[in-house]
Structure formats: C-alpha cells, structure tokens
C-alpha cells in the first residue's frame, strides 16, 4: 500500500491519503490519523520511507513513528530521492559533484533556496532524524546518481541505486517530417525555479522565441499536478527540465516515454552507474 500526501500539489496517486490541513490543528488531526493507522501498518516484509520527513510532522514526532514501524515490520528501507541532510551536507561540504543544488564547482551557491535548505537540514532535528534513519534502516535506495553519490561513501554496503521506474505503454507515434514550428514545453516548480535552474532555461527559451517567433511555440506551466502535467506536455516536441541535474528525473523520463525530447540532465556519470 502507498500511504502519502501525494507530494503536495503534484497529487500523485496513493492508497491512503495523509495530507495535512493548515495550522496547528491540522498537525494534531494528522498525528491522530497516523496513530489510528499504525495498527494497520504492521506485519509487512518491507516498509520504505520516501524521505526522512515521511509525514508532514515535526521531526521530533516522527522519531516515535519510525521506531514503531521498524519494531512491527520485517525490513525498513530509506529512500534517497530528494532533499535531505546527506544531499545538503555532502554537496555543501565535500562537493563531489561538479554542480548541484548547493554548489557550482567549489563555490557554495548563495541563492535564497540553497541557504534556506542548508539551514533547515544541517545540524537540526530533521537532520538528526535523517542520520538515525540512515543508520538504522536495513537498506538505502537512491533514485538518481547524484543521491547515490551522497549516501554511498557513508553506507557502501547497504546503499543501492535503483533507477526510477516508468510504465511503458504503446510505442509513440512520432511524425517523421520536420514541423514548421518547434513545440517547446517547460514546467516551473513553485518557488524553486532559481534553485533548479529553470529560470535560466526559461530566459533562454524566451530569447529564442523573441528572435525566431515564427519558428517556436513556447508553453510555460506552473505547479500542475503530475497527471495534468503529463496531459499538457503531450504534443510537444521537446521539454526543458532542470539545469542543475546530472540525471533525468520523473518528468523527463515520462516525456521520453511518449517520444518527447528532454533538454536537461544527462551527464556521463548517470550512464556509467
């Protein structure tokens, strides 16, 4: 079963919804709901945590829930799929990647989002929860090369890279003739465009559109749920993804599954792993 909040506005499908309402009352209601669900979350062979903050609760609340789930199930697996303490710390201190959300070369990025995430994860309650879970979980699964690079040095025996899965449908019908206009699609994450580098890619696309208005159709969307994002993307020739990524993530993988070209991360390391 999938117990999730749908990753907020992305609204991914799930079996049990644990979205949080706003405010302290929302936190109390969510905590009560989770404690009511805990007896149903026993006896499983594997429990996988998508992130150290696996519910929308403060880290100090999640310690006890993690211990309960670990005690009453066989194996636990921590997912390295995005923002967490290892990603923030390693990319800010050791800097094994040529570029990331936190560094360009050996220089720390000082944009607002990077500063906020470092402050949020390094030496904090949620950071300590991440360290505990990484140490006590039976395995760690990472979905991108970048995240594997941050966990593997600390846990070489139990860190495994498993690429993101995509459900393959029928082969897309791709026209052979060159279109008169290129249909270019770019999705902007709310409040994270500078952090992910999509602001730079958008400016580049807008300049091409300005210089060659008869050669390019540019569609820009913001904050769409995943299913709507995929529907809106259909019919595009190419999508522009994150600038600071070594590896295609879920959106470009889904795009390529439908025959849409991805302009984004594709560094040699992501293929060599």
Could you tell me what each predicted segment is?
Residues 160-196, 202:
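Conserved donor-binding/catalytic core segment of Leloir-type glycosyltransferases
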Residues 244:
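Aromatic "clamp/platform" in nucleotide-sugar-dependent glycosyltransferases that forms part
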Residues 87-88, 118-159, 203:
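A short, active-site helix/loop in glycosyltransferases that binds the activated sugar's phosphate group
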Residues 41, 64-71, 75, 101-140:
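Membrane-proximal helix-turn-helix segments that form the acceptor-binding/catalytic region
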Residues 12-20, 78-123, 191, 267, ...:
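Acceptor-binding helix/loop patch of EC 2.4 sugar-transfer enzymes
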Residues 38-61, 75-79:
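Short N-terminal targeting/anchoring amphipathic segment
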Residues 230, 252-257, 271-272:
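Short alpha-helical segment that forms part of, or immediately flanks, the ligand-binding pocket
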Residues 261-265:
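Short hydrophobic beta-strand element within catalytic cores of glycosyltransferases
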């Amino acid at each position: 079963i999938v117990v999730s909040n749908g990753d907020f506005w992305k609204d991914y499908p799930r079996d049990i919804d644990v979205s949080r309402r706003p405010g302290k009352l929302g936190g109390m209601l969510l905590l009560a709901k989770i404690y009511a669900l805990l007896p149903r979350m026993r006896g499983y062979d594997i429990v996988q945590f998508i992130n150290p903050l696996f519910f929308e609760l403060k880290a100090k609340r999640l310690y006890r829930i993690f211990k309960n789930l670990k005690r009453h199930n066989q194996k636990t697996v921590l997912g390295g799929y995005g923002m967490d303490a290892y990603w923030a710390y390693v990319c800010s201190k050791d800097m094994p990647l040529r570029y990331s959300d936190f560094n360009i070369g050996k220089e720390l990025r000082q944009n607002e989002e990077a500063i906020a995430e470092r402050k949020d994860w390094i030496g904090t309650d949620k950071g300590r929860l991440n360290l505990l879970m990484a140490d006590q979980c039976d395995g760690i699964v990472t979905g991108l090369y970048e995240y594997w690079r941050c966990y593997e040095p600390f846990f070489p025996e139990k860190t495994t890279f498993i690429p993101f899965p995509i459900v393959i449908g029928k082969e897309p019908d791709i026209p052979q003739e060159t279109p008169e206009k290129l249909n270019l699609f770019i999705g902007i994450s709310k409040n994270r465009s500078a952090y992910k580098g999509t602001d730079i890619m958008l400016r580049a696309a807008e300049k091409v559109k300005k210089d060659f208005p008869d050669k390019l159709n540019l569609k820009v969307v913001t904050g769409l749920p995943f299913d709507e994002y995929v529907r809106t993307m259909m019919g595009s020739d190419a999508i522009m993804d994150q600038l600071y990524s070594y590896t295609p993530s879920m959106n470009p993988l889904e795009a390529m599954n439908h025959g849409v070209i991805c302009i984004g991360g594709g560094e040699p390391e992501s293929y060599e792993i």
